[in-house]
Structures are given as C-alpha cells and as structure tokens.
Amino acid sequence: AVKYTVTLSTPGGVEEIEGDETTYVLDSAEDQGIDLPYSCRAGACSTCAGIVELGTVDQSDQSFLDDDQLNDSFVLTCVAYPTSDCQIKTHQEEKLY
C-alpha cells in the first residue's frame, strides 16, 4: 500500500506516524505507540473525532458526522484512511457540539 506521513496534533504535542490507505488512522497510531481517544471503533460515535488541517482522508465508512461537520473538516479517526500526507488535530469531540 502507498505510505503517507500522518501528523497528529495532540494535546501532548505533535506526533508523526506512518499511515497507508488500507489502515485506519487510529489503528496506525496505536500500532506506533500513540494512544488516541476512541469508543465504538465503528464510525458511529464522536469520541475519536479530529479535524483534518492539511491533506485528505477517506472516511466513507463513517455514519455519524453530518454534511456540515464533514464540510468543517471533522474526521472520525477510527474509520479514516489517509489518502495523502495529512495533518489531523485530535481530541476534538467537544468542538462538534
């Protein structure tokens, strides 16, 4: 699979991980020792929400975010594949509401 650099802007600092278009961002982060918030792991809640600040992701598996939230660049990291090098601000659940 094509490899991408995913930059995670977390409350604890900026972390760079390697991702690819077949692995969800949340899984890639965990595989590389970075704990991000999650609950359902199925794209059906908002615990893992982040904001895509740069780049693109495919989160067609998600069922929670509405069009307005998607247009505001919100992302559910548990069901998002990177489709380019990207930067995601994590821990954004409270900003959804």
From Swiss-Prot:
Binding of [2Fe-2S] cluster, residues = C40, C45, C48, C78
Keyword terms of this UniProt record: 2Fe-2S, Chloroplast, Electron transport, Iron, Iron-sulfur, Metal-binding, Plastid, Transport
Q: How is the cofactor bound?
A: Binds 1 [2Fe-2S] cluster.
Entry's localization field: Plastid, Chloroplast
* Protein name (record): Ferredoxin
Q: Which PANTHER family match?
A: FERREDOXIN, FERREDOXIN-2, CHLOROPLASTIC
**What NCBIfam families is this protein classified in?**
fdx_plant
